[in-house]
């Protein structure tokens, strides 16, 4: 958390800091989701919050880089390839601001896209549980 404060919060302009909340500890799942539900969507680098967001129908843009694992590929699998960016690729990194603005400017379309992805996830979950039910009975 200290690195994040130093690299992010401390670098913000003085007029922006009063509108930003810095937390010294990780928040609990319910705290995170209650905030995400009130937002236009999420933009992040780790998969936990985006997964929770899509599970609630909240749009989520994900940025990854080579040192992270391939788990970001799940965004393509569930139909959110347009919301997955490889920050090691300059042309992809340059497209991030436009994607975030599009999400914010058309929240209805973004929520519809998130809902479609959630439906895909629910189908995978049903199919997986059906396999387990067959194998375990």
Describe each region flagged by the PLM.
Residues 1-137:
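Active-site anion-handling motifs in enzyme catalytic cores
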């Amino acid at each position: 958390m200290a690195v994040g404060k130093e690299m992010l919060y401390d670098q913000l302009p003085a007029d922006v800091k009063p509108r930003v909340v810095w937390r010294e500890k990780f928040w609990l799942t319910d705290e995170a989701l209650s905030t995400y539900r009130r937002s236009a969507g999420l933009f992040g680098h780790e998969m936990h919050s985006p997964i929770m967001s899509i599970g609630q129908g909240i749009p989520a843009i994900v940025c990854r880089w080579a040192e992270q694992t391939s788990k970001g590929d799940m965004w393509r699998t569930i139909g959110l390839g347009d919301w997955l960016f490889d920050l090691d690729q300059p042309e992809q990194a340059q497209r991030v601001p436009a994607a975030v603005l599009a999400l914010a400017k058309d929240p209805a379309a973004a929520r519809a896209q998130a809902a479609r992805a959630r439906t895909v996830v629910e189908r995978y979950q049903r199919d997986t549980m059906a396999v387990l039910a067959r194998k375990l009975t």
